[in-house]
Amino acid sequence: MSLIEFPLLDQTSSNSVISTTLKDLSNWSRLSSLWPLLYGTSCCFIEFASLIGSRFDFDRYGLVPRSSPRQADLILTAGTVTMKMAPSLVRLYEQMPEPKYVIAMGACTITGGMFSTDSYSTVRGVDKLIPVDVYLPGCPPKPEAVIDALTKLRKKISREIVEDRTLSQKKNRCFTTSHKLYVRRSTNTGTYEQELLYQSPSTLDISSETFFKSKSPVSSYKLVN
């Protein structure tokens, strides 16, 4: 190569060479190829299934659904989580390789939904079992909301550092896999203490003189006024 061709090389190299860091390259590759593990237990999963069709086409985001947690880096929980399902959900999360992310989809997953008031077997929030990165409220959320949640997760991935995320999860998170059920007496049975409702005749027949003698001395002027 002659010396005359060097200026031409300098002009074309600025458009063909990209300078970046290994962290940015890793984040870019991860946010562009999320492989979700679909943990659907209720009607919210039907809304997510509509993303597979041609109308929304979630393949354009690089999503490839996986059936094995060892090949997934995103778990999407949709629907009610019961006490019996809690250990299996935690095990699936632990089998996923780092870095891994969680999207809680629907009111039943986030707070227990309508089953959280009277049900004895519903987990009141999946974040009591595994750490959640994006909360997606709704009953059920629309497919457009799911796309918005995925976009927010992609933005979060593009700004993070893998080492800092792993250390923060080890220090600040505490997972609970065992749920104990304590049977207590109900407060709405309709039976009450009879002593509080009905006083005995001995307490009702107390004269006024005896009553005032047991109390502190009060003048008649104070009683009248």
Swiss-Prot record:
It is found in: Plastid, Chloroplast thylakoid membrane. Binds 1 [4Fe-4S] cluster. Keywords: 4Fe-4S, Chloroplast, Iron, Iron-sulfur, Membrane, Metal-binding, NAD, NADP, Plastid, Plastoquinone, Quinone, Thylakoid, Translocase, Transport. InterPro entries: NADH_UbQ_OxRdtase-like_20kDa, NADH_UQ_OxRdtase_20Kd_su. It is a peripheral membrane protein. It is an enzyme of class 7 (translocase). Its EC number is 7.1.1.-. It holds the Pfam family Oxidored_q6. GO terms for cellular component: chloroplast thylakoid membrane; plastid; respiratory chain complex I. [4Fe-4S] cluster binds at residues 43-44, 108, 139. Its cofactor is [4Fe-4S] cluster. One of its GO terms (biological process) is photosynthesis, light reaction. PANTHER family: NADH DEHYDROGENASE, NADH DEHYDROGENASE [UBIQUINONE] IRON-SULFUR PROTEIN 7, MITOCHONDRIAL. NCBIfam families: nuoB_fam (TIGR01957), PRK06411.1 (NF005012). NDH shuttles electrons from NAD(P)H:plastoquinone, via FMN and iron-sulfur (Fe-S) centers, to quinones in the photosynthetic chain and possibly in a chloroplast respiratory chain. The immediate electron acceptor for the enzyme in this species is believed to be plastoquinone. Couples the redox reaction to proton translocation, and thus conserves the redox energy in a proton gradient. This is NAD(P)H-quinone oxidoreductase subunit K, chloroplastic. It comes from Oryza sativa subsp. indica. The gene is ndhK.
